[in-house]
């Protein structure tokens, strides 16, 4: 029986709804599934060479039961045996060491990679996708259509960056690390940009700041790609009174039928970052049938709740089948 281990971090601002969805679909297809919260989870080998994952247990709602000042006697769940020949590892919410403050999560996944496990997604893929500047470099290298983007390297770098960008206001300012539209700002003048850059550097001297040309649009598109196949796509309208389209910011997703060029370029974008399961975000071209869309970023831990409800359950089931297929291919 093939196994799926889902390693994730249950952030109050990014709840673990997706891992419950994936677990249920995978179990329905006959996979044995372990949900493990990154915090507190560790792995070790026994003297006879067998590897186990040790993690805290879950309650009936899938919430991790962790020790606290009021609940000090929480024990680890029964160790879960894994083997490269029959186990898939899915790492969600791994972030980067700068973002999470914890290198051990990525290091644990590297152990699995070194030992031959199929890890969805790889640590390299996570590192690329959790850095918007690295996303941009990959897009440029692989000849994707993407908004012009420049990195600001120091507190007084706004003027140089504007000259390098060579784009009209308004502009978009982003921090290199961030999700759900957080850290994305609308800039209307050089004075506003200069002041904001100085403020951000005052708060964090190691921050990475990007400025990007603004592509006017009524919506952007999120495409879920799994192992080279498209599971579904949604249109995310711009939020009223805002310029962002994240579902977490209030955008209400709708079905989106991809053109041939949108579909092929989305698959190519997922492949460019080495992703097995990704969310690819783009702004459509004016002539969608002929021109390439503007790619914004690839997400290595895409949430599936918004797209699953919009597609009426049409995304998670094929995902489960893909995971099962990946599992059966482990031994071939």
Which functions belong to the PLM regions below?
Residues 11-148:
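Conserved N-proximal alpha/beta basic substrate-recognition cap immediately N-terminal to
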Residues 94-96, 176-178, 301:
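Short glycine-rich anion-binding loops that position phosphate/pyrophosphate groups of nucleotides
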Residues 299-311:
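Glycine-rich phosphate/pyrophosphate-binding beta-alpha loops
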